Swiss-Prot record:
Keywords: Chromatin regulator, Cytoplasm, Metal-binding, Methyltransferase, Nucleus, S-adenosyl-L-methionine, Transcription, Transcription regulation, Transferase, Zinc, Zinc-finger. This is N-lysine methyltransferase SMYD2-A. It comes from Xenopus laevis (African clawed frog). Zn(2+) 1 binds at residues 50, 53, 72, 76. Its EC number is 2.1.1.-, 2.1.1.354. The gene is smyd2-a.
């Protein structure tokens, strides 16, 4: 099993392990692909996507026993059985009470795979799952308690089919999954599932990444979004890059236990535009701005929690009230305004309030293009959503323009032969 050409694992100064280019890669060029070591389709996409290959199609066939897993055909069903058998009978016996989290489901699959797979897999040419960083010593009590509740769920839902190692080994594995797991997303950045991609996990983070990770089914594809020269380290981004430096580093420290020293974090060059305030004849005081940033950070977190218990209408009202309040100090292109507009747009799409969704999307797209790096999937997916909204509302001229903007980014990020590209080209022919 050979390593991809033009790349090598190395010790990155101050960062630990990393991946380095040993030749040049052009913009849009594929560096390598990595099949998922294990993966799981998210509950809400059941019936829309095949549980095995993640293909999106109508008329998928149900598992005859549990009626909860869906497949393209018999081959996909057989391919998935080694993993689905961990859950099939438990789904039947627990019925509505079968509710392990996605992390628990993914970890159960890792344990099952490790039982049968003793050799290194094609997903581990640079880095093996056993080498994953866990940051166990850095976990606070809250994170440890979450892991313990995941372990309890693992015992509850999987004890018939999995024989566990001791508790300490499970804590270690869950900590590894929390730091090294990936979410698989579609072309509009909707969540499709969770997966482990060991070779992708080797790459270090930068807020100015030179590659982008996209997905073709359950395979990760890594392409250059800047020219890469021999000797350059290959950097991905672990987080959403919309936010200002302090927020990005808080998120990195909370999830991955480090802060970033990339060019963007050192210069904070984009922060003034990201945090721009209104130019008023009576400018707000420094304290007023500080208080509003604090309010904005709190409302972002509050909204994230509210999604689990509030109705869509209540969520939309929450967005509108916060936008009114922040709008007295922040300009519309301020990232906290954009964050709440994006949430509001999502609620409007869910409620099928197309005009409302369009209103927010139109305000978001221009600042997104400024705040995000070139060839950003966040920008591409926003153009795509807008294009599809325009087309649905029979505004074909402007819809065509928006879809073409999405296409221009995606041809670099996803590669010209990706099935998403073919689908969008088909939409442009209508």
């Amino acid at each position: 099993m050979g390593q991809p050409e033009g790349l090598e694992r190395f010790d990155s100064p101050g960062k630990g392990r990393g991946l380095k280019a040993t030749r040049s890669f052009a913009l849009g060029e594929l560096l390598f692909t990595c099949p998922a070591y294990t993966y799981v389709l998210t509950d809400t996409e059941r019936g829309n996507h095949c549980d095995f290959c993640f293909a999106r199609k109508e008329g998928l066939s149900k598992c005859g026993k549990c009626k909860q897993a869906f497949y393209c055909n018999v081959d996909c069903q057989k391919g998935d059985w080694p993993m689905h058998k961990l859950e099939c009978s438990a789904m039947c016996s627990y019925g509505q009470n079968w509710c392990p989290s996605e992390t628990v489901r993914l970890t159960a699959r890792i344990l099952a795979k490790q039982k049968t797979q003793t050799e290194r897999t094609p997903s581990e040419t640079f880095l093996s799952v056993k080498e994953f960083e866990s940051h166990l010593s850095k976990l606070d009590n809250e994170k440890k308690e979450l892991i313990e509740s995941d372990i309890a769920a693992l015992h509850r839902f999987y004890s018939k089919n999995l024989h566990y190692t001791d508790n300490a080994a499970l804590v270690f594995l869950f900590a590894q999954v929390n730091c090294n797991g990936f979410t698989i997303e579609d072309e509009e950045l909707s969540h499709l599932g969770s997966a482990i991609f060991p070779d992708v996990a080797l790459m270090n983070h930068s807020c100015c990444p030179n590659i982008i990770v996209t997905f073709k089914g359950t395979v990760a594809e890594i392409r250059a979004v800047q020219e890469i020269h021999a000797g350059d380290e290959v950097f991905t981004s672990y987080i959403d890059l919309l936010y200002p430096t302090e927020d990005r580093n808080d998120r990195l420290m909370d999830s991955y236990f480090f802060t970033c020293d990339c060019r963007e974090c050192s210069t904070k060059q984009k922060d003034p535009a990201k945090l721009e305030i209104r130019k008023l004849s009576d400018p707000p005081s420094h304290q007023t701005v500080k208080d509003m940033i604090k309010y904005a950070r709190n409302i972002v977190e509050e909204f994230r929690r509210a999604k689990h218990y509030k109705t869509p209408s209540e969520l939309l009202e929450m967005c509108e009230l916060s936008l009114d309040k922040m709008g007295s100090v922040f300009v519309d292109s301020n990232v906290y305004m954009l964050h709440m507009m994006y949430q509001a747009m999502g609620v409007c799409l869910y409620l099928q309030e197309w005009d409302g969704a369009l209103k927010y999307g139109e305000k978001i797209i221009k600042p997104y293009s400024k705040h995000y790096p070139a060839y950003s999937l966040n920008v591409a997916s926003m153009w795509l959503k807008l294009g599809r909204l325009y087309m649905g509302l029979e505004k074909t001229t402007i819809g065509t323009k928006a879809l073409k903007k999405a296409l221009a980014i995606m041809q670099i990020a996803h590669g010209p032969d990706h099935h998403y590209i073919a689908e969008i080209k088909k939409e442009l022919e209508l």
